[in-house]
Amino acid sequence: MRYIKEILKKNRIWVLVYIGLGIFNAFMANYKADYFQKVIDGLADRTLAFAGVATYGFILLVNYCMNYLDNYPEKKLEHGIYLDFKLLSLRKISTIDYTEYQKIGTGKLVQRIENGSTAGRNVLFNFWLRSIRDLLPTIGFSIYFIWKIDEKVTYVLFVGYAFIFIITNILLKFLYKIKEKILNSEELLNHYLVRGYMEMLVFRMSKQFPSEIKKTCNAKEDIVSSKVKMNMIHEAFFTIFALFVTMLDIGILFYAWKTKNLTVGSVVALIALIENAYTPIAVFNVLYVQYKLDKASYKRFEEFLGLKDDVQLRNGNAINTNVGKIAIRNLSFQYEERKIIDGLSLSIQKGEKIAFVGESGSGKSTLIKILLGLLKYNQGEVRLGDMELKEICLNNLYDRVSYLSQDAPVFDGTIKENLVFEKQVSEEQMLGALSEVQLSHLVENLAEGLNTEIGEKGTCLSGGEKQRLALARLWFEDSELVILDEATSAMDNLTEENVMKSVMQKMKDKTVIAIAHRLNSIAGFDRIILFKEGRIVGQGTFEELLHTDSYFMDLYNANVK
C-alpha cells in the first residue's frame, strides 16, 4: 500500500474533487428518479403545475452538466495514476542495487511493469476511488429513496444483495486460477518477443525463429483461451444479475397490482431506483473480481519496486580528493559460491595510464564494477585518493568518473543528445570532438546533422561508429578517472590506433584504466596489469612483459593469430 498512498498523496487535490463530484452526481441521479415519481403522479391526478415541470427540467440540466464536468478529473486521474506507476518503475531502476538489476530479464521486466502499472491503476482508481465516490453513494441514496416509498421493498433488496454476494464468491474461485495462468503466459510471451526483437541476427543465422515463433504461438494460445474463459465467467455473472433484476421488476409490478398500495409514479420510481441500487452492485462485483485478480499482478510489481536499493547512491561522504589515485589492498569478491577476486592488491597513481589484461573471467570487469561502486566487495580495502570507497557517496563519485563499456553506451536519441546530454555546448565544439574520433563524415552525410536520431541502442550506426560516438563524449566530461572496458573492440585496427591516440592525448592529465583484448592498442600505456583467476600475476610495460612474461606472450600470440 506504500506506493498507492504515495500516488494518492501526489494527486490528492484531484482525488478530492473527483470524490466530491461523484457523491453529488450519485445524489442527483437518485433524486431525479424520486422527483420523476411526483411528475408522473401529478400527470395522473392532473395536479402537475408548470413549476414542477420546470424544476424537473432544472434537475435534469444540472445532472447532465455535472456528469459532463466529471469527465475532466476522471480522465486526468485515470491516465495520470497509470503513468505515475510507470514513473515509479523508472525511479526504481535509477536506484536499484546493481546485482538485483542483473537478475532481471528485460522482457519479463517490461511485462511486469506494464501489467503492474495497469493493475495499480485498476486497484486504486477503478476499485477504491470508484467504490467510494460512485458505487457506495449510489447504493446509499437509492436505498434511502426506496425506503421512503416502501419499506418492504427495501428488505427484499438486502436479501438480493446476499444472493449476489454468494454467486460472486463462487465465480471468484475459478477466476483466480485463470488469472494466474494468464500472468505467467503473458510474461513468457513477452520474454520470447523481446528476445526475438533484440537478437534478430543470432536467431536468423541459427535458424531459430521457427522454434521461437512456435513457442510464442503456444503462449499466445494459452493467453487467448484463458481470457475467453474469464470473459465467459464475467458474462455469466451479468446474465444472472440481469435475470435477477428482471424478476424484481416483475415482482414490483405484481406487488403493486395485488396490494393497490403504490401509485403509478411510485412503481416507475421504484423500478428506476432498483436499477440504480443494483447496477452498482453488479459493477462492484465485477470490479471486486478484477481487484482480486489485479492484486496478483500488482504484487509482482510491488516485489520489483521493493527490490534492494543501492543506498550508497545518496548516502556517504562528499569527495574532497582526486579519485584518480587508487589503492587496493587484499581485495576479495565472491558472487554466490564463486570467488571472482581473491586477495588482490594494486596501486595506481594520479594520471597513470593502466591496462587490465587477462583471460575471460579473470576478474578484470568485476574489478572495474567494484571501482564504480556497482558491486560491493566482501573484504579488503579500496581507496580513491585518501577516501575509502565504501564511505563515498556514489552520485558524487560519478561526477568525477567517466565509464565506457564494451556495449557502447549510446541510447535512442539524437547524435547531439548522445554527445552532451542536456549540456549547453556549441555546435562547433561538438563537431570538433566528432572529428577527433573520426566521425565527421557521419554528420556531414546526414540531412539532420547533429539532430539525427540514431535509433534504439544506436541501430542506425555500425558497432565502431557507436563506440566512437561514445568516446567523443569524453571531450565534454570533466572527470578525473576514465575507465574504458573494451571501448574500441568493434573498430578496425587502423581506426582504433588513430582514435586511441586522440583519446589519450585528450586524457593526458587524467588517470585512465582500460581493459583490452587487442594488446597492440595498449602498447603505449604506462603499465599493464595481468589478471588470472581473480589474482594479479604480473605487471610491467608492454615491452617488458612481451620479453619476460610467458602468460602475456601467450595472450599476445593468441591475439595476433
Model-derived regions, located:
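Cytosolic ends of transmembrane helices, especially the final helix of ABC transmembrane type-1 domains
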Residues: Q208, M232, N276-G306
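An intracellular "coupling" helix at the cytosolic face of ABC transporter transmembrane type-1 domains
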Residues: Y98-T99, N115-W128, I132, L136, ...
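Hydrophobic transmembrane alpha-helices
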Residues: F58-V62, L193, V267-L287
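A short amphipathic helical element positioned immediately N-terminal to and/or at the very start
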Residues: M1-K10, L109
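ABC-type nucleotide-binding domain
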Residues: T321-K561
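Short intracellular "coupling" helices and adjacent cytoplasmic loop segments at the cytosolic face
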Residues: P73, H79, L87-S117, Y192-K215, ...
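A hydrophobic transmembrane-helix motif
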Residues: F27-Q37, L129-L172, V228-I271
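Transmembrane helix-loop-helix hairpins at lipid-water interfaces of multipass membrane proteins
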Residues: V15-L69, P73, W147-T154, V264
